[in-house]
Design a protein with these regions (language model features):
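A short acidic, Gly/Pro-enriched loop at the edge of an enzyme's catalytic core
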Residues: 63-75
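Conserved short alpha-helix immediately C-terminal to the canonical SAM/SAH-binding motif I
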Residues: 32-36, 84, 111
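Short alpha-helix
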Residues: 108-122
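Conserved beta-strand signature within the Rossmann-like core of class I S-adenosyl-L-methionine
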Residues: 99-106
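A short glycine-rich, Lys/Arg-flanked "PGG" loop and its adjoining helix->strand segment in the class I
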Residues: 86-98
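A short SAM/SAH-binding and catalytic strip from SAM-dependent methyltransferases
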Residues: 74-86
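Conserved SAM/SAH cofactor-binding pocket of Class I
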Residues: 1-58
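Core SAM-dependent methyltransferase catalytic element
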Residues: 125-127, 131-142
């Protein structure tokens, strides 16, 4: 099961479903994301019962955290600004199964170390840091 935090258009979860993930959950703050996800699932032939969408703040809302679930996910993806990843990372750790993978992206190069430090502070192991021009992705394991 994959969790896409800040799902937006749903593209990360949708592509994951197209490539073999069996079930995905997406969270976003913006209610407009629901329609964007629905349209993108339809365009890409993804079955609606494979993707559950939730609107709310997973960082600060215990109800959303409970709905998302704990130790449920094999993979969590988050293409969000570093400023959001910092408080998000300890929450993600609780969502991941032991050994689960956390993939972050959308990080500007100057913020790389902040995200790496947040991942380590949450008790996760940094597996890889990928850089492309001014953008960085950090991959970690719980």
């Amino acid at each position: 099961v994959l969790l896409d935090v800040g799902t937006g258009s749903g593209i990360l979860a949708i592509v994951s479903l197209m490539y073999g993930i069996k079930e995905a959950v997406g969270t976003d703050l913006d209610p407009c994301a629901v329609e964007a996800v629905r349209e993108n699932m339809e365009v890409n032939g993804v079955n609606a019962d494979q993707f559950e969408m939730m609107i709310g703040n997973i960082i600060s809302d215990p109800e959303i955290q409970d709905r998302v679930g704990y130790e449920r996910y094999d993979i969590v993806v988050a293409n969000i600004l570093a400023e959001v990843l910092l408080p998000l990372t300890p929450v993600v750790k609780k969502c991941l199964k032991p050994g689960g993978i956390y993939i972050t992206s959308g990080i500007i190069a100057e913020k790389e170390q902040l995200v790496v430090d947040a991942v380590k502070a949450a008790g996760m192991e940094v597996l890889e840091v990928t850089r492309q021009n001014e953008w960085v992705s950090v991959t970690a394991r719980r």
